[in-house]
Amino acid sequence: MAGGKCLALIAHDQKKDDMAAFARANRDLLSRWKIVATGTTGGRVLDAAPDLDVTRLKSGPLGGDQQIGALISTGEVDALIFFVDPLTPMPHDVDVKALMRLAIVYDIPMALNHATAIKLLPTLEA
């Protein structure tokens, strides 16, 4: 992912509608970024805002969270917005924890809910 800043977008199943609405409402700010997203989340974002530059990776449970983690560790992802569903058990919970751990280790900005994402996005430089 050469050139430009990269933002990762992920949403658990129960939060995908929220992520689509977030993308639609913030398309002007998001249009300044290269976006990587897990498969289904990326599809929902593109449906909501087809003009965004979104690269879809694998679905989270099929390795997408790990792909984004790898991009964080190589410095290719500059910020993470991850709408987490804390009320639904996730079979790939260990992948989610590893992803969050990498965002912390590599000290990139990370929002885990809509309220934080709304505050964070305008402060980021694309």
Swiss-Prot record:
Stored Gene3D superfamilies: Methylglyoxal synthase-like domain
Keyword set includes Lyase: yes
One BP annotation, GO: methylglyoxal biosynthetic process
One Gene Ontology term, aspect cellular component: cytosol
Active-site residue numbers: 65 (proton donor/acceptor)
Positions of disulphide bridges: none
Function summary: Catalyzes the formation of methylglyoxal from dihydroxyacetone phosphate.
Name used for this protein in its record: Methylglyoxal synthase
Species for this entry: Rhizobium etli (strain CIAT 652)
Origin organism lineage: Bacteria, Pseudomonadati, Pseudomonadota, Alphaproteobacteria, Hyphomicrobiales
Name of the gene: mgsA
